Regions:
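Glycine-centered small-residue hotspots that permit tight backbone geometry or close packing
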Residues: 1-5, 33, 106, 182
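N-terminal amphipathic/basic-hydrophobic helices that include classical n-h-c signal peptides
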Residues: 1-15
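Alpha-helical structural elements
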Residues: 4, 25, 38, 73, ...
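N-terminal small-domain helix-loop-helix segment of the aminotransferase-like
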Residues: 12-106, 113
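Conserved core of the PLP fold type I
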Residues: 76-195
């Protein structure tokens, strides 16, 4: 440990691991797909469409560009972290109470927030055996137990997921379309689960 000018302490790399939670030490790092420029250079191609990260290959619509240009003068201010306007629009569109809506900055953020808010140590979190890896990693970070259900023809086996519910189950993750298999389940199938 070395002190530095600001009055705090700098901990060398060999000590950093001692600060990390055991639940995080056991996780394999998430490795995202290669950046577009790297793929272009490696394979000597000009156009790459990256589907793995849900990126829009067409860019913003003109409507979005117009809205952004109108907001440029207030870009120095923090946005509404409670997403009041967005919640009001969603509530109006689906005729539900705005207090039932939870917004976040992308799925990674929402998954993490759900796990931190809902899961206690040793609670169970049900998911497909092959699905978005953030469900399992965030479940493990909070000390909960991922319950992985085998796939059925590369699809989430919804019936088996429902059968796996116990008194320790706090979260069931339905990825639709499922990442990485791309398979889907219908609205009718989902409603049948909710009604159980």
């Amino acid at each position: 440990i070395k002190s530095y000018k600001g009055g705090g302490f700098l901990i060398g790399k060999k000590y950093m691991k001692d600060l990390i939670k055991d639940e995080i030490k056991s996780l394999a790092p998430y490795i995202a797909g290669k950046p577009i420029d790297e793929v272009k250079n490696k394979y000597k191609i000009n156009r790459v469409v990256k589907l793995a990260s849900n990126e829009n290959p067409y860019g913003c619509s003109n409507k979005v560009k117009n809205i952004i240009s109108k907001l440029i003068n207030s870009s120095n201010l923090y946005p509404d972290s409670a997403s009041c306007d967005l919640k009001a629009e969603i509530a109006k569109t689906f005729n539900i109470d705005k207090n039932m809506i939870f917004c976040g900055a992308g799925s990674d953020s929402l998954i993490k927030d759900i796990c931190l808010t809902v899961l206690n140590k040793y609670d169970e979190s049900i998911m497909g055996e092959v699905t978005f890896p953030r469900y399992e990693s965030n479940t493990l970070i909070v000390g909960a137990i991922p319950v992985k259900i085998p796939m059925k023809n590369n699809k989430l086996d919804i019936e088996k997921m429902v059968e796996a519910i116990t008194d320790k189950t706090k979260v069931i993750w339905f990825c639709n379309p499922n990442n990485p298999t791309g398979t889907i389940f219908t609205e009718k199938e989902f409603i049948s689960i909710v009604n159980k």
